[in-house]
Each structure stands twice: as C-alpha cells, then as structure tokens.
From Swiss-Prot:
It is found in: Mitochondrion; Mitochondrion matrix; Mitochondrion inner membrane. Mitochondrial acyl-CoA thioesterase. Catalyzes the hydrolysis of acyl-CoAs into free fatty acids and coenzyme A (CoA), regulating their respective intracellular levels. Regulates both mitochondrial lipid and amino acid metabolism. It comes from Homo sapiens (Human). PROSITE patterns: HOTDOG_ACOT (PS51770). Transmembrane segments: none annotated. Belongs to the acyl coenzyme A hydrolase family. This is Acyl-coenzyme A thioesterase 9, mitochondrial. GO terms for cellular component: mitochondrial inner membrane; mitochondrial matrix; mitochondrion.
Length: 439
C-alpha cells in the first residue's frame, strides 16, 4: 500500500498554455476580456433568464418552456466548437478589492477553500454555456448542471487573502450530452499569476425545463496538444466506468482487500478470550463509528441556483467544511486539504429541503486522513431520506494520526472504499509549510 501525497498541478498539463493557443500563466489582472467574480452568476442568470428574486421564479421557469423549439434534434445539426471558444478567465480581486475578503477569510488569515469550490462550480457551468452559445438567441435553451467533480488537485502554494486570484478554464472533451471542463486557479505573486489548483468537472446538458437530456455542440481539437486533452477526456470517461463497475456495492473485495480486513479483525480480538465476539481496540487506534460528525441544513431560497434548485457549490462547501471539522477533531491538529475526487451529483436538492450531512473518517495512513461525507435530503412533508451526494476528501494533518478500525462488515467496506480513493492519488510529494488552505 503505497504512501499517498499531495497531487501537484503542472501549468500546461491540464489546460492549454500560451504557446498552444490559449492565454495562460502570467497575466495582467486588469486586462480586458476578463470577468469579475461577481459577473459570473449575473452572466448565468442572463443566459438562462433566471429571476433575481424568489417570488418571480415560477414565471421565469414558465418562460423557459418556450425555448424548447431551439433544442437540436441531433448532435449532427450543431456546429462544432473549438476549445478556445469556451475559454474564459475570471478575476477574484482579493488584493485590489479588500471588501471582498471577508467572505473568503478564515480566522487563520487564509482563504476558505469551501468558497473556492462554489466559484469553481459556477465557472464550470458558464464555460459550458460559452461552448454551446447560440448567437441568434438571447437565452440558451439548455439547462447545464454539474454531474461530477472528477478531481481537484492542490498545488504547493499558499492562498493569501490579500492577493488577487484568477480562474481560467475551457471545455476539454465532449460527448453527446456531456462535457468535461478543465479549470485552473492562479494567485498573484509579485507581478505574475502562479498556479495553485487544477480541477476537472463533468457537466451535463438538459432540456429547457431540466427534465431530459439535450445535445451539445461537438468539439474539434485543432492541435496535437488539444488532441491529447481530448484523448485524456476519453480515458477519464473509461476510468470512471471501470471504477464504477468494480464498486464494492457491485463486486466483492479483492483477495488482497479481504486479507486486509481479516487481519484487522484478528488484531481486535481479545487475546484473553477464545471468542470472535470480544473486541479490543489496538493501541493508537479509533473505532470508525467514533469518528462521525453530523450536521443539518435548511435549504433556503438564498442558496438556489439559476434553475431554482439548491446550488451545487453550496452543497460542496457545506460537505467540505464538515469534512474539515471531522479531520480536525480526529487528528487533533489543523488539517490541510490534499485532494477532492469523485463527487457524484445523484439527485438535485429542492429549495425547502432538509439537508442531512454525515461525515466520518474511513481510512488513515501516517498523517493522511480520508473523509467520506454522505448527503441526504428529506422534504418537510415526507420523512423519507434520499441520498443526493457522496463526497470524498483527502486531508493531511500536521502530525501522525491514529489508525481507524471498522467494527462491522459495512464499515469494512467503507474502509476499503476509502483506501481505494486514497491510493488513486498521484505519487509522492511533500506538503510545504506555506501551503495553507482552510474551510
């Protein structure tokens, strides 16, 4: 079982670089053509015709029904797009506009990663609308939503609340109704923007009423570098299918995994008795059931997205903050986020729902903590809970953390699933002291 480490994002590995046709890397933050962070949500409302106040949301959605005739009957009837057609840059001017800092500030004077997740979610949707832009129509007939956060890789750079941040991204792969989006985040150091984060999201297109799938414009790579990005998108799709097909919900653990669980079970048996029922916790270990934290959120209209469902970025922020608190409580010191991966949006969350979040440590190794957050919703009228998301976060603690031990078969499967996510990370690196990302 190899040691996991911080996944580094390399400028140009996940997106196009200056020499490859798209503007990247060091930039003047005052350049023309760059969106302000506040403009992203405003632009999205304009594209879909969303209401700015809750009382008009029904009327706005009724107007969107009229856009159904603009939907393509097949993908063949849609003009192809280039990667640079969807490329956009967004500025978060924490340094030049100090009034923005309060929203992003932690008590340790660093940047709230949960807020960054919200911004990435909005940016990913806007990028896809740019890819599918219809010049003859004021509003888009598509309802584009986040289907999956494939991965977010952190770089060894500190996130200062006193320096400007820039986001950039573009569509890198397209299927029939889905799109992969590559995004990067940079922070100003001196007179240049340096990369601090690399993210891959998968978005899906729905019809104007968000009831069924809709076709998206095809994507044509224009260079060997773009062809490689597109090929990587195909590989990512295959990897996700393979990972899903071998899920512990579908297949039994491997022989090696079964051995791991059995050895852990044997190490918890009381040597003073000859019984499978008497369990003793090994030294420097914690029962998995004792690592849980829970929270409840009432989903108010303020947290709605442009389609009057609860904003996916809000769900990610709340899940991340609970996961961070779980890792902090478990490890006894300040944790640092290393990776986010495989966040599947299984079901939309309606405004007015009760959101139940349950977080627990499911795997540890050395000073790494793998946290799983399970999200459920229930309406005020019905008591039945429905799963909407499962979130996976990897943290690194400032000191070595206890081992986590499962008691039941179900917890053993959570342990193995956490181990799989942990081992899926890229190979070794060291966390620098200036790498500070907090809730």
């Amino acid at each position: 079982m190899r040691r996991a480490a911080l996944r580094l994002c390399a400028l140009g590995k996940g997106q196009l670089t200056p020499g490859r046709g798209l503007t990247q890397g060091p930039q003047n933050p005052k350049k023309q053509g760059i969106f302000h962070i506040h403009e992203v949500r405003d632009k999205l409302r304009e594209i879909v015709g969303a209401s700015t106040n809750w009382r008009d949301h029904v009327k706005a959605m009724e107007e969107r029904k009229l856009l159904h005739s603009f939907l393509a009957k097949s993908q063949d009837g849609l003009p192809p797009r280039r990667m640079k057609d969807s490329y956009i840059e967004v500025l978060l001017p924490l340094g030049s506009e100090p009034e923005l800092r309060e929203k992003y500030l932690t008590v340790q004077n660093t940047v709230r990663f949960g807020r960054i997740l919200e911004d990435l979610d909005s940016l990913g949707v806007l990028i896809c609308y740019m890819h599918n832009k219809i010049h003859s129509a004021k509003m888009s007939p598509l309802s584009i939503v986040t289907a999956l956060v494939d991965k977010i890789d952190m770089c060894k750079k500190s996130l200062s609340p006193e320096q400007d941040i820039k986001f950039s991204g573009h569509v890198s792969w397209v299927g029939k109704t889905s799109m992969e989006v590559k995004m990067q985040m940079f922070q100003l150091h001196g007179d240049e923007f340096c990369p601090v984060l690399d993210a891959t999201f998968v978005m899906v297109a729905r019809d104007s009423e968000n009831k069924g799938p809709a076709f998206v414009n095809p994507l044509i790579p224009e260079s060997p570098e773009e062809e490689e990005l597109f090929r990587q998108g195909e590989l990512n799709k295959g990897r996700r299918i393979a990972f899903s097909s071998t899920s512990l919900l579908k297949m039994a653990p491997s022989a090696e995994e079964r051995t791991t669980i059995h050895e852990m079970f044997l190490s918890t048996l009381d040597p003073k008795t000859i019984s499978f029922r008497s369990r003793v916790l090994p030294s420097n270990a914690v029962w998995m059931e004792n690592s849980k934290l829970k929270s409840l959120e009432i989903c108010h209209p303020q947290e709605r997205n442009i389609f009057n469902r609860i904003f996916g970025g809000f769900l990610m922020r709340k899940a991340y903050e609970l996961a961070w608190a779980t890792a902090c409580s478990f490890g006894g010191s300040r944790p640092f986020v290393v990776a986010v991966d495989d966040i599947m949006f299984q079901k939309p969350v309606e405004v007015g729902s009760l959101l139940f979040l349950s977080s627990q440590v499911c795997f540890t190794q050395n000073n790494y903590i793998q946290v799983r957050v399970h999200s459920e919703v229930a309406s005020l009228q019905e008591k039945q809970h429905t799963t909407t998301n499962v979130f996976h976060f990897t943290f690194m603690s400032e000191k070595e953390v206890p081992l986590v031990f499962p008691k039941t078969y179900g917890e053993s499967m959570l342990y193995l699933d956490g181990q799989r996510h942990f081992n899926s990370m890229s190979g070794p690196a060291t966390l620098r002291k200036d790498y500070l990302v907090e809730p």
